[in-house]
Swiss-Prot record:
Together with ABCG25, export abscisic acid (ABA) from the endosperm to deliver it to the embryo via ABCG30 and ABCG40-mediated import to suppress radicle extension and subsequent embryonic growth. Together with ABCG9, involved in pollen coat deposition of steryl glycosides required for pollen fitness. May be a general defense protein. It comes from Arabidopsis thaliana (Mouse-ear cress). Residues 160-434, 826-1078 form the ABC transporter domain. ATP 2 binds at residues 871-878. This is ABC transporter G family member 31.
Length: 1426
C-alpha cells in the first residue's frame, strides 16, 4: 500500500488473487459485482475513523482482457474525498451518473433507492398562496416619460405629498388579481401566460423577493408557516430572466463560488451520518460509486465542489467550464450558455424550492428538453418543489410537467393537472387544432386577437370571451372546485421535517464567508492586472514629472518663497493620492448588480464582500505610497532623514486608504455611475477647498470653519507640513520674522507647529478610512439597486380601434409593405472563417495558430423564400450570418459570396440589406415611434416623400403590432421600458422600415412566448411574401414556426453543413432525407420535425453509429442540387449591372446630422440622471465656492488675497470640469453600442453622428455656465462691469466645453469606460500640477514649460485672472513685493496684460482639438469584437 500525493491510497490486487477471493462465472454482471467487492474490500482495510471520508474507486487501464473482463493491472484506489483533484471529481461524477448523456436519472434513482432501503425520507416543502393581490402605482401617459420637466415635477410632488400638502396622483395597476393555489413537492409545475400576465411577479412573490414598492395582500406559506417565520431567501431560489455575472470569472469559478456560499454540501451532509449508521446496522452495502459521490458532495468548506462538476455536466456546461462568462463588450460564452450559468448558479446549492423564470431563452429545444428533464428527475426523485415559467415550451417539454398554472391579465385562468387543461377549454367551446402545440394554444386562446380561430362550438356564434369570464368559469368548474378543496384542507405541520425550512440567514460561518469573498476578490485583481499595473505605472510617471518639476537643484531651504514651493509639492502628492482613488468608483458600480443578486439570495453578508475588497486594497495602497515616495522624496530633496521619509510614506498610504474608502462609499450610496461621479466630485470639492492649502485656515469664513475640521485632507496637509518643516534644516533664522524659516512658514499658512499633529493626522485619516468602509458595508447591507422595473401605463387614443383587426386591414398591410425594391438572390460557396487560437487553448497544448469556426459552407438564399439556419448552440449560425452580412470585425474569411451573380460589395450591400441582431440594442430614451421614424428617415431613399415615409412607418408598426405602444419609452433591457418580446419586435421593425431586399434575422423568436413568436413569424412571413429574401437563425422552433419556413440550412458544431435544401410540406423532404440514413430512428407521429432533426444528429448518435453527417450530406443528391443551383445563380443575368448607388448613404451629410441631432436632443432631454443632476450639482458647487470665497474678489490689498482668488478659480475649473468630463463618459459609452449597430446598418456616416453628439451638449453647457457664472461672479465679489462679467462667462463656457469634449474623447479612444476613467485621471493630475497655480509659470523649469503651454487649465486661469484683475492699478505694499495688482500678476503668475484674446482663442482651439479627436475615434476605431 502506497500513499499518493493527493491523500489517495493504492491497493494493487493482481487479477489471480482477485479471482481466488471472488471466484464467479465470467460475465459482465459478475465482473461488475467483483469490482464492487474489490472496492469494499479496500475500504474495509482502512481504520474505521477514516472510512467515513474515504472511498474506493477503480482506475480503469486502457487494455481490457478478453478472458476475464478485468483490466490488465486495474488498480483499486482509495481516495480521501476531502482531497480530490479535478480529474478525480470529474471521474466520480462520470461514474455516479453512469451515462455519457446529459442525464441524472440513474444517479438520482440510485440515491433515492439507497434512502428508501433504510426508510429515510428527504425533507419536502409545500408552497401555498391564498387570495394573492399585487398592486403597483404607476404614472400614466406622457407624464411617465422621464423628461427633465417631469422628473422635477415628480420630485416636488413627492416632497409635497410626503408633507401631506397634496395627494399623490398615480394610477393603480393590478398585477395579480385574487389568485390562490398550491405547488406540491414531487410534482413539476409549469407557469404559462402571455407577456404582462404577472408570471414574474408571482414567482418573485412566492420567493419572498417582491419589490417593496408593490402592495401585496393575501397569504403565502411554506409548509404552513408564514414567510416571516424562517429565512425564505435561503429556503427557495428565484432564477432570474436577466443574466448578471462577473464577466471576468470562468463558468466553473462562478459555480464554485455559488456552491461554497450556498453550502452545497448541506444537501447530503444532513443525513450522511444517519444513513451510514442505519446501513451498518442493517448490513446494507450501497453502490460504491453512489457512496463516493454522496460522501464527496457532503464535504464542507472545500474550494472546489463535486456539486459544481455535477451541475456543469447536467446543464451541458462542461464543454465551456474554463471559458470566461463575458458580457456585451467582452467575449465569453454564448447567450444560451450564459442563461444556463444563471440556472446553475442557483441549482448548485442545496435549495429544493425553485422558482424559475424563463430559463430557456436562447437555448435550442433539445437542450431545453434535456435540462427540464433533469429538473423533472430531481423533482420526482428528490421530492423538490419547482414552479417554472417557460415562454415557448415544445410539446415534448410541455409533456414533462405534472401540473399547470395559466395566468392571463393577472387572473388565474387554470390550475391543476396538465392533462385536464384541454378538457377545460373544450368545455368553454374551444378546440386545439391538429399540429398545434398545447402551450401555444393556451397562450393564444385568451388573447383578443387570436381567440376566434380556436372557436369550435357550432351551436352558438363566436363572441369574444374576456379573461375575467374565463377565470370565473374556471372557479365554477369541477377543475376549480378540485383546486379549492385541496386548498381548504390545512397543511399537516406534524408531518413536516423541521430541517426543510432554513432558520439561519447564511449557509456558512462568517469566517468562511470572508475567506470565500477574499479568494474571489484576489482572483479578480489578477484578472484586472492590466488596470492595476497601469494605475501603478501612472503613479510612477506622475511622480517622475513632479520630481523633475521640483528638482532639488532648483530648491533650497533658504527662504519662505522656496518653502512655499516645497509646500506645493507636498500638497500635490496628497491630492494625487486622493484623485488616484477616483477610478475605484466605476469599478465598484460595475460590480453592484452581481453583488445585489448574491446578497438577496443569502450567498454572503455585505460585510464579508466589503471587508475582503477593503483588505485587498491595503497592499495596493502600500505599493502606490512606496512608488510615489521612492520616485519623489529624495529627487525633490525633502528633509533628508530616514525617519521622516518613512513617515511621509505612511501618510501617503493613509491618504490613499481614506480616498479609496471615500469613493467606494460614494459608489455604494449613489448606486449609479452618473450620480456617483457628480456627488463624488462635490465631496472632493469640499474636502479639497477646505484642506488648508487653497485657503489658509485663518482666511476661511466662520460659517465654513467646521468644514476645515471635518475635511480629511486638512489633517493630511497639517501632518505632511509638520513632518517637513520641523526638520533641522528649516531651523535657519528667517529674514522677515524673528523665528526660524520653517516655523514662520507654518504660521503664515495657519499650520500648527507641534510634532504631535503628525500622529493626529495619521490617526484621523485611518479613522476616516475605517468610517467610510463601515458606511460602505451598511449601504451594501441596507440599500437596494436603483431603477427598479416599472410598468408604464400609456394613454393611447387608438387602443380600442387597434384591437379590432379586420380582414381588409390585413390585406392592405400586405400591400403596404410594397415600397419599390429590387428582389435579390444571394449565393455563397465554400465559405470558411477562422479566428486566432484563444490563449487558453494554446496554453493547453493545441498546436494550431488558428481555430476554424466555419468549414466550406455553401448555399443559396432566394427572393420570396424563407430560409431557416438551424443548429445546436455553438454550431456557427450567428458566425455564418455575420460573415455573409459583412459584420465581422476580426478573423479571416475565405470563399465566394455573390449578390444576383455579382461579387458582394460591402458598402452597397449595407444599403440593400437589414440585420436583426440577437441583442436588442436601442437608445433607451426614445419612444417606439421615434426609433422607427429615425431608422426610416435615414435609410429610405431621398426620393420618398415625408408623407410616404410616415405612412410606411405606420404600416410597419401595425404589421409587428407595436401601434398600441407607439409612445412607450424603449428603456434599458431588464429594468425599464419595453418587455423582452416588445424589444424584439422593435428590433425587427427598425430593420423593416429600411425596406431592405435581403434581411438577416439572428434569433428573432428567442426570449418570446409562443404568441409573440407567432406574431413575429407572421411579420417575417408577410415580409417574405412581398418578394424579399429572408434568412433566420432559430433555436427553439415549434411545429408551426418551423413549418413557416421554405428551406433549411442545418449546421453542426465545427461550422459544417449537414443538410441544405427544401423542407417540403409538413417537412416531408427533410424527414425523408434523414430517415434514409442507416441507423437514424424514425420520427413518431405528431412529433416536431425540428426537435427530431436536432435529436438524431447529435455527436453522441454520430459516435454510436460511427458516421459523419457532414460527409453523408456531401455525397447526397441534396448537396448536388444545391451546388448546381449555386453554379447557375453565380453567373449574372445578361445585361444586368451590379447594384450601385451614387452615394454610400441614402441621405446627405446635412440630413444625417440633423436627424442625429434630433435623436440626441430627445436622449438628452429624457436623461434627467445626467442633465438634471449636472445642473443641480453645478448650482450646489457654485454656492459652495461662492460662500467659501465670499467677497474675496473685492480684496486686493495683499498678495495672499490675490493667490486666494487664483485658488478659487483654479478649484472651480478643475472640479466642475472634471465632473463634466466624468459624467459624460457613461452617456457616450451607452450610446456607442447603439452607434455600432446603426453604423453597421449603414444609417449614417460617423462624422455627422459625432457632430450631433457634440453639438447637443452646447445648450446644456450654456445653461450650466449661466447658472454657475451668475452665482459665483456676484458672491466672490468681482467688479460689477458688464464687459468683465461677459468675459468671465465666456471663459467658463469654453472651460466646461473643452472638459466635456475631453471626456467624450477619452471614451472614444478606449475600449471601455473603466479604462477611459483611469487614463483621463492621469491627465487631470498633470493639468493640476502645471496649470500655474501650484507652481507659478515663472517657477516652472525650462524643460517643462512646453507642457504649460499645452495645458488647457493654464489658459483658462490666465484668461479669467487677466479679464478680472489685469487692469487693476491698486497698490500692494509687502516686504517681498511693492507695486500695482497688474504688476504683481505679471511678476508672480507671469501673465502679460494683452493676452485675453489669445487665451480665448487657444481655448476655442482646445475645444476643436478634443472634439476632432472624438470624431476621428468614432470614425476609425472600433472596439466591438465580433
Amino acid at each position: 500500500m502506497a500513499a499518493a500525493s493527493n491523500g489517495s491510497e493504492y491497493f494493487e490486487f493482481d487479477v489471480e488473487t482477485g479471482r481466488e477471493s471472488f471466484a464467479r462465472p465470467s460475465n459482465a454482471e459478475t465482473v461488475e459485482q467483483d469490482e464492487e467487492d474489490l472496492r469494499w474490500a479496500a475500504i474495509g482495510r482502512l481504520p474505521s475513523q477514516r472510512q467515513g471520508t474515504h472511498n474506493a474507486i477503480l482506475r480503469r487501464s486502457q487494455t481490457q482482457t478478453q478472458t476475464s473482463g478485468y483490466a490488465d493491472g486495474n488498480v483499486v484506489q482509495t481516495i480521501d474525498v476531502k482531497k480530490l483533484d479535478r480529474a478525480d471529481r470529474e471521474m466520480l461524477v462520470r461514474q455516479a451518473l453512469a451515462t455519457s448523456d446529459q442525464d441524472n436519472f440513474k444517479l438520482l434513482s440510485a440515491i433515492k433507492e439507497r434512502l428508501d432501503r433504510v426508510g429515510m425520507e428527504v425533507p419536502k416543502i409545500e408552497v401555498r398562496f391564498e387570495n394573492l393581490n399585487i398592486e403597483a402605482d404607476v404614472q400614466a401617459g406622457t407624464r411617465a416619460l422621464p423628461t427633465l420637466v417631469n422628473v422635477s415635477r415628480d420630485f416636488f410632488e413627492r416632497c409635497l405629498s410626503s408633507l401631506r400638502i397634496i395627494k399623490p396622483r398615480k394610477h393603480k395597476l393590478n398585477i395579480l388579481k385574487d389568485i390562490s393555489g398550491i405547488i406540491k413537492p414531487g410534482r413539476m409545475t409549469l407557469l404559462l401566460g402571455p407577456p404582462g400576465s404577472g408570471k414574474s411577479t408571482l414567482l418573485l412573490a412566492l420567493a419572498g423577493k417582491l419589490d417593496k414598492s408593490l402592495k401585496k395582500t393575501g397569504n403565502i406559506t411554506y409548509n404552513g408557516e408564514n414567510l416571516n417565520k424562517f429565512h425564505v431567501k435561503r429556503t427557495s431560489a428565484y432564477i432570474s430572466q436577466t443574466d448578471n455575472h462577473i464577466a471576468e470569472l470562468t463558468v466553473r469559478e462562478t459555480l464554485d463560488f455559488a456552491a461554497r456560499c450556498q453550502g452545497a454540501s448541506e444537501g447530503f451532509a444532513g443525513y450522511m451520518k444517519d444513513l451510514t449508521r442505519l446501513e451498518k446496522e442493517r448490513g446494507i452495502r450501497p453502490s460504491s460509486e453512489i457512496d463516493a459521490f454522496m460522501k464527496a458532495a457532503s464535504v464542507k468548506g472545500e474550494k472546489h465542489s463535486v456539486s459544481t462538476d455535477y451541475v456543469l455536466k447536467v446543464l451541458g456546461l462542461d464543454v465551456c467550464s474554463d471559458t470566461m462568462v463575458g458580457n456585451d463588450m467582452m467575449r465569453g460564452v454564448s447567450g444560451g450558455q450564459r442563461k444556463r450559468v444563471t440556472t446553475g448558479e442557483m441549482t448548485v446549492g442545496p435549495r429544493k424550492t425553485l422558482f424559475m423564470d424563463e430559463i430557456s431563452t436562447g437555448l435550442d429545444s433539445s437542450t431545453t428538453f434535456q435540462i427540464v428533464k433533469c429538473i423533472r428527475n430531481f423533482v420526482h426523485l428528490m421530492d423538490a418543489t419547482v414552479l417554472m415559467a417557460l415562454l415557448q415550451p415544445a410539446p415534448e417539454t410541455f409533456d414533462l410537467f405534472d401540473d399547470l398554472i395559466l395566468l392571463s391579465e393577472g387572473y388565474m385562468v387554470y390550475q391543476g393537472p396538465r392533462e385536464d387543461v384541454i378538457a377545460f377549454f373544450e368545455s368553454l367551446g374551444f378546440r386545439l387544432p391538429p399540429r398545434k402545440g398545447v402551450a401555444d394554444f393556451l397562450q393564444e386562446v385568451t388573447s383578443k386577437k387570436d381567440q376566434a380561430q380556436y372557436w369550435a362550438d357550432p351551436s352558438k356564434p363566436y363572441q369574444f370571451i374576456p379573461v375575467s369570464d374565463i377565470a370565473a368559469a374556471f372557479r365554477n368548474s369541477k377543475y376549480g372546485h378540485a383546486a379549492d378543496s385541496k386548498l381548504a384542507a390545512p397543511f399537516d405541520k406534524k408531518s413536516a421535517d423541521p430541517s426543510a425550512l432554513c432558520r439561519t440567514k447564511f449557509a456558512i460561518s462568517g469566517w468562511e464567508n470572508l475567506k470565500v469573498c477574499f479568494v474571489r476578490e484576489l482572483l479578480l485583481i489578477k484578472r484586472h492586472k492590466f488596470l492595476y499595473t497601469f494605475r501603478t505605472c501612472q503613479v510612477g510617471f506622475v511622480g517622475l514629472v513632479t520630481a523633475t518639476v521640483f528638482l532639488k537643484t532648483r530648491l533650497h531651504p533658504t527662504s519662505e518663497q522656496f518653502g512655499n514651493e516645497y509646500l506645493s509639492c507636498l500638497f500635490f502628492g496628497l491630492v494625487h493620492m486622493m484623485f488616484n482613488g477616483f477610478s475605484e468608483l466605476p469599478l465598484m458600480i460595475s460590480r453592484l448588480p452581481v453583488f445585489y443578486k448574491q446578497r438577496d439570495n443569502s450567498f454572503h453578508p455585505a460585510w464579508s464582500w466589503s471587508i475582503a475588497s477593503w483588505l485587498l486594497r491595503v497592499p495596493y495602497s502600500v505599493l502606490e505610497a512606496v512608488v510615489w515616495s521612492g520616485v519623489v522624496y529624495f529627487t525633490v530633496g525633502l528633509a533628508p532623514s530616514a525617519g521622516r521619509f518613512f513617515r511621509y510614506m505612511l501618510l501617503l498610504f493613509s491618504v490613499h486608504q481614506m480616498a479609496l474608502g471615500l469613493f467606494r462609499m460614494m459608489a455604494s450610496l449613489a448606486r449609479d455611475m452618473v450620480i456617483a461621479n457628480t456627488f463624488g466630485s462635490a465631496a472632493i470639492l469640499i474636502v479639497f477647498l477646505l484642506g488648508g492649502f487653497v485657503i489658509p485656515k485663518a482666511d476661511i469664513k466662520p460659517w465654513w470653519v467646521w468644514g476645515f475640521w471635518v475635511s480629511p485632507l486638512s489633517y493630511g496637509q497639517r501632518a505632511i507640513a509638520v513632518n517637513e518643516f520641523t526638520a533641522t534644516r528649516w531651523m535657519t533664522p528667517s529674514a522677515i520674522s524673528d523665528t526660524t524659516i520653517g516655523l514662520n512658514l507654518l504660521k503664515l499658512r495657519s499650520f500648527p507647529t507641534n510634532d504631535y499633529w503628525y500622529w493626529i493626522g495619521i490617526a484621523v485619516l485611518i479613522g476616516y478610512a475605517i468610517l467610510f468602509n463601515n458606511v460602505v458595508t451598511l449601504a451594501l447591507a441596507y440599500l437596494n439597486p436603483l431603477r427598479k422595473a416599472r410598468a408604464v401605463v400609456l394613454d393611447d387614443p387608438n387602443e380600442e380601434t387597434a384591437l379590432v383587426a379586420d380582414a381588409n386591414q390585413v390585406i392592405s398591410e400586405k400591400k403596404g409593405m410594397i415600397l419599390p425594391f429590387k428582389p435579390l438572390t444571394m449565393t455563397f460557396h465554400n465559405v470558411n472563417y477562422y479566428v486566432d487560437m484563444p490563449k487558453e487553448m494554446r496554453s493547453q497544448g493545441v498546436p494550431e495558430t488558428r481555430l476554424q469556426l466555419l468549414s466550406n459552407v455553401s448555399g443559396v438564399f432566394s427572393p420570396g423564400v424563407l430560409t431557416a439556419l438551424v443548429g445546436s448552440s455553438g454550431a456557427g449560425k450567428t458566425t455564418l450570418m455575420d460573415v455573409l452580412a459583412g459584420r465581422k470585425t476580426g478573423g479571416y474569411t475565405e470563399g465566394d459570396i455573390r449578390i444576383s451573380g455579382h461579387p458582394k460589395e460591402q458598402q452597397t450591400f449595407a444599403r440593400i440589406s437589414g440585420y436583426v441582431e440577437q441583442n436588442d440594442i436601442h437608445s433607451p430614451q426614445v419612444t417606439v415611434e421615434e426609433s422607427l421614424w429615425f431608422s426610416a428617415s435615414l435609410r429610405l431613399p431621398k426620393e420618398i416623400t415625408k408623407e410616404q415615409k410616415k405612412e410606411f412607418v405606420e404600416q410597419v408598426m401595425r404589421l409587428v403590432e407595436l401601434d398600441t405602444l407607439r409612445y412607450a419609452l424603449v428603456g434599458l433591457p431588464g429594468t425599464t421600458g419595453l418587455s423582452t418580446e416588445q424589444r424584439k419586435r422593435l428590433t425587427i421593425a427598425v430593420e423593416l422600415v429600411a425596406n431592405p431586399s435581403i434581411i438577416f434575422m439572428d434569433e428573432p423568436t428567442s426570449g418570446l412566448d409562443a404568441r409573440a413568436a407567432a406574431i413575429v413569424m407572421r411579420t417575417v412571413r408577410n415580409t417574405v411574401d412581398t418578394g424579399r429574401t429572408v434568412v433566420c437563425t432559430i433555436h427553439q422552433p415549434s411545429i408551426d414556426i418551423f413549418e413557416a419556413f421554405d428551406e433549411l440550412l442545418l449546421m453542426k458544431r465545427g461550422g459544417q453543413v449537414i443538410y441544405g435544401g427544401k423542407l417540403g410540406t409538413h417537412s416531408q423532404v427533410l424527414v425523408d432525407y434523414f430517415q434514409g440514413i442507416n441507423g437514424v430512428p424514425p420520427i413518431s407521429s405528431g412529433y416536431n420535425p425540428a426537435t427530431w432533426m436536432l435529436e438524431v444528429t447529435t455527436p453522441a448518435l454520430e459516435e454510436k453509429y460511427n458516421m459523419e453527417f457532414a460527409d453523408l450530406y456531401k455525397k447526397s443528391d441534396q448537396f448536388r442540387e444545391v451546388e448546381a443551383n449555386i453554379k447557375q445563380l453565380s453567373v449574372p443575368p445578361e445585361g444586368s449591372e451590379p447594384i450601385s448607388f451614387t452615394s454610400r448613404y441614402s441621405q446627405n451629410q446635412l440630413s444625417q446630422f440633423l436627424l442625429c441631432l434630433w435623436k440626441q436632443n430627445l436622449v438628452y432631454w429624457r436623461s434627467p440622471e445626467y442633465n438634471l443632476v449636472r445642473l443641480v450639482f453645478t448650482t450646489i458647487a457654485a454656492f459652495i465656492l461662492g460662500t467659501v470665497f465670499w467677497d474675496i474678489g473685492s480684496k486686493r490689498t495683499s498678495s495672499q488675497d490675490l493667490i486666494t482668488v487664483m485658488g478659487a478659480l483654479y478649484s472651480a475649473c478643475l472640479f466642475l470640469g472634471v465632473s463634466n468630463a466624468s459624467s459624460v463618459q457613461p452617456i457616450v459609452s451607452i450610446e456607442r453600442t447603439v452607434f455600432y449597430r446603426e453604423k453597421a446598418a449603414g444609417m449614417y456616416a460617423p462624422i455627422p453622428y459625432a457632430a450631433a453628439q457634440g453639438l447637443v451638449e452646447i445648450p446644456y453647457i450654456l445653461t450650466q455656465t449661466i447658472l454657475y457664472g451668475v452665482i459665483t461672479y456676484f458672491t466672490i465679489g468681482f467688479e460689477r462691469t458688464f464687459s468683465k462679467f461677459v468675459l468671465y462667462l465666456v471663459f467658463m463656457f469654453l472651460t466646461f466645453t473643452y472638459f466635456t469634449f475631453y471626456g467624450m474623447m477619452a471614451v472614444g479612444l478606449t475600449p471601455n469606460q473603466h479604462l477611459a476613467a483611469v487614463i483621463s485621471s492621469a491627465f487631470y493630475s498633470l493639468w493640476n500640477l502645471l496649470s500655474g497655480f501650484l507652481v507659478q509659470k515663472p517657477l516652472i523649469p525650462v524643460w517643462w514649460i512646453w507642457f504649460y503651454y499645452i495645458c488647457p487649465v493654464a489658459w483658462t486661469l490666465q484668461g479669467v485672472i487677466l479679464s478680472q484683475l489685469g487692469d487693476v492699478e491698486s497698490m500692494i505694499n509687502e516686504p517681498l513685493f511693492h507695486g500695482t495688482v497688474k504688476e504683481f500678476i505679471e511678476y508672480y503668475f507671469g501673465y502679460k496684460p494683452n493676452m485675453i484674446g489669445v487665451s480665448a482663442a487657444v481655448l476655442v482651439g482646445f475645444c476643436a482639438l478634443f472634439f476632432s479627436a472624438f470624431a476621428l475615434s468614432v470614425k476609425y476605431l472600433n472596439f466591438q469584437r465580433r
